[in-house]
Amino acid sequence: MDHPEDESHSEKQDDEEALARLEEIKKSIEAKLTLRQNNLNPERPDSAYLRTLDSSIKRNTAVIKKLKQINEEQREGLMDDLRGVNLSKFVSEAVTAICEAKLKSSDIQAAVQICSLLHQRYKEFSASLTQGLLKVFFPGKSAEDLEADKNSKAMKKRSTLKLLLELYYVGVIEDSNIFINIIKDLTSVEQLKDRDTTQTNLTLLTSFARQGRIFLGLPISGQDEDFFKGLDVTADQKKSFKKAFNTYYDALADLLQSEHKLLLQMEKENAKLVNAKGELSEDSASSYEKLRKSYDHLYRNISSLAEALDMQPPVMPEDGTTRLTAGDEASPSGTVKDTSVPEPIWDDEDTKTFYECLPDLRAFVPAVLLGEAEPKSNEQSAKAKEKLSESSSEVVENQQTTEDTTEVSADSASMDDRSNAEQPKEKEEVEKEKAKDTKKEKGKEKDSEKKMEHEKEKGKSLDVANFERLLQRLPGCVSRDLIDQLTVEYCYLNSKTNRKKLVKALFNVPRTSLELLAYYSRMVATLASCMKDIPSMLVQMLEDEFNSLVHKKDQMNIETKIRNIRFIGELCKFKIVPAGLVFSCLKACLDEFTHHNIDVACNLLETCGRFLYRSPETTLRMTNMLDILMRLKNVKNLDPRQSTLVENAYYLCKPPERSARISKVRPPLHQYVRKLLFSDLDKDSIANVLKQLRKLPWSECEQYILKCFMKVHKGKYGQIHLIASLTSGLSRHHDEFVVAVVDEVLEEIRVGLELNEYGAQQKRLAHMRFLGELYNYEHVDSSVIFETLYLTLLYGHDTSEQEVLDPPEDFFRVRMVIILLETCGHYFDRGSSKKRLDQFLIHFQRYILSKGHLPLDIEFDLQDLFANLRPNMTRYSTIDEVNAAILQLEEREHASSGDKVSIERHSDTKPSNKSSSDVISSNGKSTAKDIRENGEAHGEESDSDSGSGSVVRDGQNEELDDGNHERGSESGDGDDYDDGDGPGSDDDKFRVRQKVVTVDLEEQADFDQELKALLQESMEQRKLELRGRPALNMTIPMSVFEGSGKDHHHFGRVVGENGEEVLDEENGEQREVQVKVLVKRGNKQQTRQMLIPSDCALVQSTKQKEAAELEEKQDIKRLVLEYNERDEEEANGLGTQILNWTSGGSRGSTRTGEGSGKSGGSRHRFYYHQGGGGSYHARRK
């Protein structure tokens, strides 16, 4: 439990830190106000003052070049340079340089300071700068602009917009109408047609909305409100800005809706293709992934803009195809199998309805169109034929009678003609009219018969086309409603020929479309009630195919065999295939239980084995078959795959008896911890959760809290950083807990690599993300991250288990690396960590290329990763290119390490020691004793005029060597180099490592001779040089330095050639300064001492110059030491990795200790953000 005193102390400390931050914010606002006031009312120097400054072209050109590389580190130096030059004639060049500068977000304030300085000095600078910056948003359509990199142009626009806003806030730019033109161009609806331009404009508008809330009339909270009150933004301008943003946001919402509809349509089409063909083509999958990625990116950007505008993000209607839903967890309470109660045949009501509730065709189709109505129609046609024959015989009789009557009438007529000669003409006319009428009737009958035949032919062709279309729709019927509708439609096209075609189409189902077998079987079962020949023909064809496949005994056509046996099983569940046929097929497979027969038997049992086992009439026989199956499995020496198949089929038919599932009972304290971490934790409640965790009895709950922290995969993926923040918060009070968390995370990552289980992939990704967040909160070092990255790539390789641990087709390790680098890789942008990340990314590319073809999602993630971390890095396309790059990298490292080794060897040899001692003695009167005395001072100023700088450096190095080898400074001049195991042991060490290299003796001798000559020449030259002397503008005779210290005791403080103040020893008052004047008499040069007043301009300028040089040296020395300490912290893991060096072990340990001591504050310094609910820990800055 925490003591109240500790809590009060921590709360007091938090309050003090909050007050300090508020004070810093207040000072920053006051500085901005002062700068704004100076820019609005600039006091520009006159032309006379500007003429006194440096106006040379060379100096101005150098300063303008520096303006192209503005950053925070060079700000002060650049401003000093600008104050010392006259840029009146180079204002346009300075503006161009500033506009071309590649500014980062951290460099914006430095650019504002520099622009303010130029604005306060040159009147025309502000207008020229405004025009130059606006050209970034409204460029001319030249070829270079069109071919420029879109990514770099977007980044340039973003930084320029931020710079314009900041310049407006500080008064360099006073016209706010320029932002109206920019916003109108960005919110143009015409640009929505281009996807890339829309994404770029969205990011720019979001940045403007966040930084320029005053333009949109949005509320401003905090102390910034006083600063923004002074800005002159009219109500009309705010209205114009707000209208442009709202109009553009509405257009974006419509665009997002259309994108969503298009995505849904494509998903539905893909679903149809998958159902019809079983897979998607590469083009379809690629286009879908591209559209999906574009939609997600657009949605994220629109949500960010809505958040910046204080609006609700658009809500898309959810659809089953666009969201992933997790199934409900299994019921915690199970039931024990009771053999006394008969088990249901079907597992659920839907399955029972599918197999038992078939549609009644007589209720949807007229009986005439069904097969059972054919006999009646045949009888009717027979009767009609009889009637037609009877009527035809009657017509023949009538014709005969008419002929007889005509003959009789003709005879009588001839007699009448003879008797009555007056009437022949009238009878002839009547007979002609009758003949014409009969001819007309016969012609009409022929025409009607032709029309009937033509209509019948048209009807037949139309029926054939409709039936072909129906068969084409058959593979797409993947639901109960679709297959039932198709069955009804077929009844309208029923005929004997069509029934044969239908059976053939059902039999030739694609062997890879096994999901269609159940629906085809339902269609057959539905038609079997009216068309008895369809099921009989299909069953006969399936049985013949099974017999032919079994009797061939070849190991071919496994897919055809599985399709055949599963079709038989599905028809068995519809009771179309008798159970005896199924048992005979199963017995045929069990009689020869090898190879494909095992797969066929298992597929048959998986299809209808459970149905037969639970049916009362077949349960006994099925039980016997299952027992035979298990006995054969135990007797046969089956491979693991076949053994698993048999067990799955057996337990699917006859599940084992299991006890009831017992739900886990947790103590209330554990339930409360889980509620805090998995239910209550979010960004608003993190402070309260941290407070509640600290209130818990830590001795009882520590292990369980650690266990829950390790279950980050059971929570939301987006809340992993909150768990890391809680870890950071708890570290202030429980240091050992953080160590345990880091150890557990690293152990879990390694265990995941060792097991490589598919079911643990979500857990492994969550742990990689957690490790990255722990680095962000400064709980692990970069060395841990890089060790984990290399472990992920290399673990298990070059071993016998490589195919199991990291198969060639498995890309999960690539995803793990992507997750870790996406989480914390953006912090590796400087120092040694940047170099190490560059090296790792090259090795990472080799690992990727060794895998083969990448899936689309992995490729897209890799593109995003390299774009975010190293956009300019080369992506290699072949393994040879990346191997060449790695070889070149290793050669560079080997060359650099070889240079270091040679430098250490030559610096530790005796000739170099001798030459250094000669140089010291030649420069002045310093000896080895003086070196030791000065070396112990660690940088104190020497009273000697000669060689002070070199003596101090050598003394520092000597002290480090003394500390490393545990020796004092009592030894003589050469003891520091000859005693101990210093350089000699290093040299021996390198020789041992190089024994494997075979060197030609003649070449080695030539090399040693040339090296010796080179060193001798270098030493001869160094003897004549003056070391540690201040550089003068003239050559000074050696006689000057020989007697430079004669009168040291007469004055309190004496200076050589530069001159220093001379103090009287008695009263210590400042008198005069002693200098030496070089004169020439004849051919001889002599020096004479001269006293000049201390307030003279020469003395004052000399003193200022020396003081500035000394301060610069101290700053450079401090910066170099700090950089070395930070570099060693990153490389050595904060002092936890002790390097066992033989010659410099103590030095490494000493510096590591210092680095860790200094970095301890930075590593365990946590930042707090004040919120409504308290404070929580933020990530590294």
UniProtKB/Swiss-Prot annotation:
<dbReference type="GO" id="GO:0042742">
    <property type="term" value="P:defense response to bacterium"/>
</dbReference>
<feature type="region of interest" description="Disordered">
    <location>
        <begin position="375"/>
        <end position="459"/>
    </location>
</feature>
<keyword id="KW-0175">Coiled coil</keyword>
<protein>
    <recommendedName>
        <fullName>Regulator of nonsense transcripts UPF2</fullName>
    </recommendedName>
</protein>
<dbReference type="InterPro" id="IPR007193">
    <property type="entry name" value="Upf2/Nmd2_C"/>
</dbReference>
<feature type="region of interest" description="Necessary for interaction with UPF1">
    <location>
        <begin position="999"/>
        <end position="1102"/>
    </location>
</feature>
<feature type="region of interest" description="Interaction with UPF1">
    <location>
        <begin position="999"/>
        <end position="1023"/>
    </location>
</feature>
<feature type="coiled-coil region">
    <location>
        <begin position="1000"/>
        <end position="1021"/>
    </location>
</feature>
<comment type="subunit">
    <text>Found in a post-splicing messenger ribonucleoprotein (mRNP) complex. Associates with the exon junction complex (EJC). Interacts with UPF1 and UPF3.</text>
</comment>
<keyword id="KW-0694">RNA-binding</keyword>
<feature type="compositionally biased region" description="Basic and acidic residues">
    <location>
        <begin position="415"/>
        <end position="459"/>
    </location>
</feature>
<keyword id="KW-0539">Nucleus</keyword>
<comment type="function">
    <text>Recruited by UPF3 associated with the EJC core at the cytoplasmic side of the nuclear envelope and the subsequent formation of an UPF1-UPF2-UPF3 surveillance complex (including UPF1 bound to release factors at the stalled ribosome) is believed to activate NMD. In cooperation with UPF3 stimulates both ATPase and RNA helicase activities of UPF1. Binds spliced mRNA. Involved in nonsense-mediated decay (NMD) of mRNAs containing premature stop codons by associating with the nuclear exon junction complex (EJC).</text>
</comment>
<keyword id="KW-0677">Repeat</keyword>
<feature type="domain" description="MIF4G 3">
    <location>
        <begin position="672"/>
        <end position="871"/>
    </location>
</feature>
<feature type="coiled-coil region">
    <location>
        <begin position="539"/>
        <end position="559"/>
    </location>
</feature>
<feature type="compositionally biased region" description="Polar residues">
    <location>
        <begin position="398"/>
        <end position="412"/>
    </location>
</feature>
<feature type="region of interest" description="Binds to UPF3">
    <location>
        <begin position="735"/>
        <end position="755"/>
    </location>
</feature>
<dbReference type="GO" id="GO:0003729">
    <property type="term" value="F:mRNA binding"/>
</dbReference>
<dbReference type="GO" id="GO:0009863">
    <property type="term" value="P:salicylic acid mediated signaling pathway"/>
</dbReference>
<feature type="domain" description="MIF4G 2">
    <location>
        <begin position="469"/>
        <end position="655"/>
    </location>
</feature>
<dbReference type="GO" id="GO:0048471">
    <property type="term" value="C:perinuclear region of cytoplasm"/>
</dbReference>
<feature type="coiled-coil region">
    <location>
        <begin position="260"/>
        <end position="309"/>
    </location>
</feature>
<feature type="region of interest" description="Disordered">
    <location>
        <begin position="1129"/>
        <end position="1181"/>
    </location>
</feature>
<feature type="region of interest" description="Disordered">
    <location>
        <begin position="893"/>
        <end position="991"/>
    </location>
</feature>
<dbReference type="GO" id="GO:0048571">
    <property type="term" value="P:long-day photoperiodism"/>
</dbReference>
<dbReference type="InterPro" id="IPR003890">
    <property type="entry name" value="MIF4G-like_typ-3"/>
</dbReference>
<feature type="compositionally biased region" description="Low complexity">
    <location>
        <begin position="912"/>
        <end position="926"/>
    </location>
</feature>
<dbReference type="GO" id="GO:0000184">
    <property type="term" value="P:nuclear-transcribed mRNA catabolic process, nonsense-mediated decay"/>
</dbReference>
<dbReference type="InterPro" id="IPR039762">
    <property type="entry name" value="Nmd2/UPF2"/>
</dbReference>
<feature type="compositionally biased region" description="Acidic residues">
    <location>
        <begin position="972"/>
        <end position="985"/>
    </location>
</feature>
<dbReference type="InterPro" id="IPR016024">
    <property type="entry name" value="ARM-type_fold"/>
</dbReference>
<feature type="coiled-coil region">
    <location>
        <begin position="425"/>
        <end position="451"/>
    </location>
</feature>
<dbReference type="GO" id="GO:0005730">
    <property type="term" value="C:nucleolus"/>
</dbReference>
<keyword id="KW-0866">Nonsense-mediated mRNA decay</keyword>
<dbReference type="Pfam" id="PF04050">
    <property type="entry name" value="Upf2"/>
</dbReference>
<feature type="domain" description="MIF4G 1">
    <location>
        <begin position="61"/>
        <end position="264"/>
    </location>
</feature>
<feature type="compositionally biased region" description="Basic and acidic residues">
    <location>
        <begin position="893"/>
        <end position="911"/>
    </location>
</feature>
<dbReference type="GO" id="GO:0005737">
    <property type="term" value="C:cytoplasm"/>
</dbReference>
<keyword id="KW-0963">Cytoplasm</keyword>
<keyword id="KW-0611">Plant defense</keyword>
<dbReference type="GO" id="GO:0009867">
    <property type="term" value="P:jasmonic acid mediated signaling pathway"/>
</dbReference>
